[in-house]
């Protein structure tokens, strides 16, 4: 657990460093908040993909998958719980590091709570989509691993609506409905596809 938390800390240190480089490079230019938000979300996407990839590589090797298959719990349930734990871990670290990111990118702190809620809702979908990517890319077949890129377009709606939500009032609850609905959509098929890939492609 300590090792996994240290991995998350390293990922968010990367986000802070990358944000600092972006902020320093454009310190004499008036930056629109949408640009700063885009930078944060792209870095968050990268952090999620790397984090989920490492967790699935370590926690779903051949021997552990065999143990999970003989467990009283369905593999889909195990995948769901694992993904929720990853979400909570990432959301907590984002909450802790976001004040520094806000300062670096000169974002308005009046949106601090709303953006953290937005990030948490985004993380739910990002992690569940990334679990499909990770389960395929960790397969023994390099040919099948290449097909994991087909899940990448699923990330695009989150980026579009995250930036688009700035045009709406972040205090308006309706601006978060898409993220909740998109998570429910991913929840319907992600654990099934992930568990299928783990069972079939890793053997």
What role is predicted for each listed range?
Residues 120-152, 202-203:
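A structural motif at transmembrane helix-loop-helix junctions in multipass membrane proteins
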Residues 155-169:
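Hydrophobic alpha-helical transmembrane segments in multi-pass integral membrane proteins
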Residues 55-86:
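Helix-loop-helix units of permease transmembrane domains in multi-pass membrane transporters
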Residues 186-203:
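Junction motif at the cytosolic side of a transmembrane helix
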Residues 21, 36-53:
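Long, hydrophobic alpha-helical segments
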Residues 1-11:
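Aromatic- and glycine-rich beta-strand/loop motifs that create alpha-glucan
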Residues 80-106, 125:
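Hydrophobic alpha-helical transmembrane segments that constitute the membrane-spanning cores
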């Amino acid at each position: 657990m300590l090792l996994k938390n240290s991995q998350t800390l390293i990922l968010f240190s990367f986000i802070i460093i990358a944000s600092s480089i972006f902020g320093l490079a454009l310190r004499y230019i008036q930056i629109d908040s949408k640009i700063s938000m885009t930078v944060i979300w792209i870095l968050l996407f990268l952090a999620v993909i790397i984090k989920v990839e490492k967790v699935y590589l370590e926690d779903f090797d051949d021997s552990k998958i065999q143990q999970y298959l003989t467990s009283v719990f369905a593999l889909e349930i195990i995948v769901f719980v694992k993904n929720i734990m990853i979400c909570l871990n990432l959301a907590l670290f984002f909450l802790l590091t976001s004040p520094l990111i806000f300062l670096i990118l000169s974002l308005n702190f009046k949106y601090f709570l709303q953006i953290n809620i937005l990030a948490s809702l985004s993380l739910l979908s990002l992690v569940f989509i990334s679990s499909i990517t990770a389960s395929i890319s960790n397969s023994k077949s390099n040919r099948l691993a290449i097909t994991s890129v087909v899940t990448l377009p699923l990330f695009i709606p989150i980026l579009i609506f995250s930036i688009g939500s700035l045009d709406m009032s972040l205090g308006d609850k309706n601006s978060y409905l898409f993220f909740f609905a998109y998570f429910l959509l991913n929840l319907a098929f992600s654990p099934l596809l992930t568990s299928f890939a783990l069972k079939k492609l890793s053997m």
